[in-house]
Curated annotation (Swiss-Prot):
Gene3D superfamilies per UniProt: D-Amino Acid Oxidase, subunit A, domain 2 (3.30.9.10), NAD(P)-binding Rossmann-like Domain (3.40.50.720)
Organism superkingdom: Eukaryota
Motif, Microbody targeting signal: chain positions: 366-368
Family of this protein: Belongs to the DAMOX/DASOX family.
pH dependence: Optimum pH is 8.0.
Any one GO BP annotation for this protein: D-amino acid metabolic process
Residues annotated to bind anthranilate 2: Y260
Name of the protein this chain belongs to: D-amino-acid oxidase
Subunit structure: Homotetramer.
Any Gene Ontology CC annotation: peroxisomal matrix
Taxonomic lineage: Eukaryota, Fungi, Dikarya, Ascomycota, Pezizomycotina
Length: 368
């Protein structure tokens, strides 16, 4: 059986999911090469900082919406059948204020919070809240069951799924994407490189995608459990400030957020912003603390900052010949990397097959 030597560059959720799906074909011999691996916490490495959850933000017929739809069955299956993966179901409410429509966060959440969304036919227990169930200042709200992911458990679990299929992991840093072809564990040059370097594709030689930009997210992790996952279309504190909370599976704590600050590279938590985040979360979900308590009722584990890899034209999944090396890109997933992970990885695998077939045809033609 002919083998395909493939290097996946990057070990975030996109790289690991793509490597796992590729490894299900025994003809693919895969090396994951990355500067950062699960267990690391670095501002360059976005995936560990994510909440993470499944709150669809793509329009129904958009690429993002289709990838979100394709990802849900996988996350549902893992939550149901693989508790060791760190994904669990959560009762979820998303609130909408009409006045947020023009804001940065209002635009980001527009599909999520609108009445009768496409995902209402996909996620279990969906219903729109009646007018008498709405808190003051809320124009409409959707309630449903979704999932929350403990990234500190899930990312290593993905590594384990890859390892069971023979994927080799190695730490490496490359100045140019074509150099990654020399990192295959066989010692031979890889037939193809899959670029899943996220925001680092902005400076990676051979790629240098200047349409990538950071959308800074700041969070507070607490021991309190509000009893549900909750979000709202905007805040009164700032155009790029967000309010959401989710409790991670397997004792991962509750994430309180947040921000969506484009072009902001600051890796240090802002203490004043942290106070605003905590106050907003308690206001949105009073069950977060004991009756009558404010932020003093929160038991803080840590503060965190991550940089979402936003791309102006959305995720890039396509093949390209760079310095004689076939490269398939899968990066630029913004704030929806986990909830599009399987959809995007499936598309990337299809593009890998196309590139390998094209490569084979060129070799066959050269022999004639």
């Amino acid at each position: 059986m002919a083998t395909n030597n493939i290097v996946v560059l990057g070990a975030g959720v996109s790289g690991l999911t793509t490597a796992w799906l590729l490894s299900k074909d025994p003809s693919n011999k895969i090396t994951v090469a990355a500067k950062h691996m699960p267990g690391d916490y670095d501002i360059e490495y976005c995936s560990p900082w994510a909440g993470a959850n499944y709150l669809p933000v793509g329009a129904e017929n958009s690429r993002v919406g289709q990838w979100e739809r394709a990802t849900w069955p996988h996350l549902r299956d893992i939550a149901q059948n693989h508790p060791e993966a760190g994904i669990h179901f959560q009762d979820t409410v998303v609130y909408n204020r009409t006045k947020d429509q023009g804001s940065t966060t209002g635009q980001w959440f527009s599909e999520l919070v609108k009445p009768n969304p496409w995902y209402g036919k996909v996620l279990p227990n969906f219903r729109e809240l009646s007018k008498d169930e709405l808190p003051p200042g809320i124009d409409n709200a959707n309630r449903f069951t979704s999932v929350c992911i403990n990234t500190a458990v899930y990312l290593p679990w993905l590594v384990g799924q890859c390892r069971k299929n023979g994927v080799v992991f190695k730490r490496a840093v490359f100045k140019h994407v074509a150099e990654a072809a020399n990192a295959h564990h066989s010692g031979q040059k890889a037939d193809l490189v899959v670029n899943c370097t996220g925001l680092s594709s902005r400076k990676l030689g051979g790629v240098q995608d200047n349409t990538l930009l950071p959308a800074r997210g700041q969070i507070v992790v607490v021991r309190n459990d509000p009893g549900l996952m909750c979000s709202i279309s905007g805040t009164d504190d700032g155009d790029d400030e967000v309010t959401y909370m989710m409790t991670r599976a397997a004792g991962g704590g509750t994430i309180l957020g947040g921000t969506y600050q484009k072009h902001n590279w600051d890796s240090l938590p802002d203490p004043n912003l942290a106070v605003r985040i905590m106050k907003r979360c308690i206001e949105l979900c009073p069950s977060l603390v004991a009756p009558g308590q404010g932020i003093e009722g929160l038991d803080i584990i840590r503060h965190g900052v991550g940089l979402r890899p936003v791309r102006e034209d959305g995720p890039r999944i396509e093949k390209e010949l760079i310095d004689g090396v076939w490269v398939v890109h899968n990066y630029g997933h913004g704030g929806y990397g986990y909830q599009t992970s399987f959809g995007c990885a499936t598309t990337a695998v299809e593009v890998v097959r196309e590139a390998l077939q094209q490569q084979k045809q060129r070799r066959d033609k050269a022999r004639l």
